[in-house]
């Protein structure tokens, strides 16, 4: 009994000397039956947004325990997101790809949810057009969202809007929240045509038309800084020729490129004064200018063929006629008959 009292006295003295257990921040008084652990996570994202999450967990034990208030730092995966619109040749469907790019050598970030918003007026509010989550409900909205965890890409598809639209998608992962914005310009891209000149050279014509939208801040297509470049690998190819053309009664700006090889998809970097965007354009139809020339060449070849046939027929008729005239003009030799003999009686 005395030994037990002595041990209790020593424990009490030690408790007075160490009033708490030091963690990363503070400590609390012990509780005989309950344990309360409060964890506060402070996260700083790449866009300077700091969030704090406080979690309180209560457990019951049959023995004495210690309540600790600890602050921990959860390290999230550093990444950025680049989104790019994609046009089809008929411009009916909307396709876009958001690529997640890691900034550190950690494993791929676990994207928990993606929410996309859109607006057509620069001053109007954004409305939700798509939602994708690792937990049900899944994929709700006007756009179809699908995430490829292996390629770390978000694929967005739907009907093409009738006017230029701003999009923003929020990516949520463990300890991270990142916003990515991109624009779908219904104009000024009027058309993109590709023509294979020979086995090694291809000509690409990009036609742009004037487009007034709040995103362009009043910038004009005919501004000296307005231009188009083609992406070929890691290089930006400038246009070989820039001119103003009229097509179907519309005034257009034409950019001509010459590429080595044959392509059905080109990536365009369009810059209108201070505003720029990159888009992937798929062209399947051949250049109508080339088709017009081909038709003209075909008609010319047909006319030449008909002239040759006409000359040949004329020559044959003339030759036959000359042969007939020759037969008529040939002297007819009279056949000599003997002098008739009359018998005299």
Curated annotation (Swiss-Prot):
Limits of the Ig-like V-type domain: 91-190
Parts of the chain that traverse the membrane: 295-317
Topology of this chain in the membrane: Single-pass type I membrane protein
Keywords, in A-Z order: Glycoprotein, Host-virus interaction, Immunoglobulin domain, Membrane, Modulation of host immunity by viral IgG Fc receptor-like protein, Signal, Transmembrane, Transmembrane helix, Viral immunoevasion, Virion
Virion surface-side segments: 24-294
A GO-annotated cellular component: virion membrane
Signal peptide: 1-23
Keyword presence, Transmembrane: yes
Glycan-modified residues: 34, 48, 95, 104, 148, 179, 198, 217, 225, 241, 244, 260
Places the protein is found: Virion membrane
Intravirion side: 318-345
Principal place of residence: virion
The keyword Transport appears for this protein: no
Region Disordered: start-end pairs: 23-42
Domain of life per record: Viruses
Role of this protein: Serves as a receptor for the Fc part of human IgG. May thus be involved in interfering with host Ig-mediated immune responses.
Protein name (database record): Viral Fc-gamma receptor-like protein UL119
UniProt organism field: Human cytomegalovirus (strain AD169) (HHV-5)
């Amino acid at each position: 009994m005395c030994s037990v009292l002595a041990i209790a006295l020593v424990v009490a003295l030690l408790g007075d000397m160490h009033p708490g257990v030091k963690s990363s921040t503070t400590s609390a008084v012990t509780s005989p039956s309950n344990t309360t652990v409060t964890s506060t996570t402070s996260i700083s994202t790449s866009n300077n947004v700091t969030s704090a999450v406080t979690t309180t967990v209560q457990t019951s034990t049959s023995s004495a325990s210690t309540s600790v208030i600890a602050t921990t730092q959860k390290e999230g995966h550093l990444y950025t997101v680049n989104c790019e619109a994609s046009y089809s040749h008929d411009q009916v469907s909307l396709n876009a790809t958001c690529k997640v790019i890691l900034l550190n050598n950690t494993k791929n970030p676990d994207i928990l949810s993606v929410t996309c918003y859109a607006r057509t007026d620069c001053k109007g509010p954004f409305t939700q057009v798509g939602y994708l989550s690792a937990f049900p409900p899944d994929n709700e909205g006007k756009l179809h969202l699908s995430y490829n965890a292996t390629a770390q890409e978000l694929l967005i598809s739907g009907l093409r809007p009738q006017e230029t639209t701003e999009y923003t998608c929020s990516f949520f992962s463990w300890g991270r929240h990142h916003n990515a914005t991109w624009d779908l310009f219904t104009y000024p891209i009027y058309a993109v045509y590709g023509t294979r000149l020979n086995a090694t050279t291809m000509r690409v014509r990009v036609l742009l038309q004037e487009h007034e939208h709040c995103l362009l801040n009043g910038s004009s297509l005919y501004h000296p800084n307005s231009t188009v470049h083609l992406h070929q690998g890691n290089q930006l190819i400038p246009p070989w020729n820039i001119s103003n053309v009229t097509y179907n009664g519309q005034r257009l700006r034409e950019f001509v490129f010459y590429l080595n090889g044959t392509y059905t998809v080109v990536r365009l970097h369009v810059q209108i004064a201070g505003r720029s965007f990159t888009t992937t354009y798929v062209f399947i139809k051949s250049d109508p200018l080339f088709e017009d020339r081909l038709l003209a060449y075909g008609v010319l070849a047909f006319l030449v063929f008909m002239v040759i046939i006409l000359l040949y027929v004329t020559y044959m008729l003339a030759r036959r006629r000359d042969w007939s005239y020759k037969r008529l003009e040939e002297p007819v030799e009279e056949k000599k008959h003997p002098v008739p003999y009359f018998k005299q009686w």
